[in-house]
């Protein structure tokens, strides 16, 4: 349960950081903006001390996860789900 909470917090932090970066003008058409957002991957990296909750849950340091709208890539495995703007995506980790 702690792992899920920590993963969710990291995902929300990554999404918040990405949302703050300027990605174009506000006059873009919503359909065009949606297409751009679907093509982008969100990278989440895990690391830290040996005493972290992620390490306690058998998650190794250096694991990188992506929130994907399509299937997981080569050498990635499905590790759960992530949500963005009301849509559910695959959480793929390597």
Swiss-Prot record:
Q: Which processes are annotated in GO (biological process)? A: antibacterial humoral response; antimicrobial humoral immune response mediated by antimicrobial peptide; cellular response to lipopolysaccharide; defense response to bacterium; defense response to fungus; defense response to Gram-negative bacterium; defense response to Gram-positive bacterium; disruption of plasma membrane integrity in another organism
Entry's InterPro entries? Alpha-defensin, Alpha-defensin_C, Alpha-defensin_N, Beta/alpha-defensin_C
Signal peptide (from-to):
1-19
**Record's GO cellular component, any one?**
secretory granule
State what protein this is by name.
Neutrophil antibiotic peptide NP-2
Q: Which organism is it from?
A: Rattus norvegicus
State which tissues express it: Highest expression in bone marrow and to a much lesser extent in small intestine.
Protein role: Active in vitro against S.aureus, fungi, Gram-positive and Gram-negative bacteria and to a lesser extent against an enveloped virus.
Query: Where is it mainly found?
Result: secreted
Q: Name one GO molecular function term.
A: protein homodimerization activity
Q: What keywords were assigned to this record?
A: Antibiotic, Antimicrobial, Defensin, Disulfide bond, Fungicide, Secreted, Signal
GN (gene name): Defa
């Amino acid at each position: 349960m702690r792992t899920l909470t920590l993963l969710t917090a990291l995902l929300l932090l990554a999404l918040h950081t990405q949302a703050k970066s300027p990605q174009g003008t506000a006059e873009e058409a919503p359909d065009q903006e949606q297409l751009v957002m679907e093509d982008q991957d969100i990278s989440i990296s895990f690391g830290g001390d040996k005493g972290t909750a992620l390490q306690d849950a058998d998650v190794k340091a250096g694991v990188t996860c992506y929130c994907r709208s399509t299937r997981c890539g080569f050498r990635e495995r499905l590790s759960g789900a992530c949500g963005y703007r009301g849509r559910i995506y695959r959480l793929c980790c390597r």
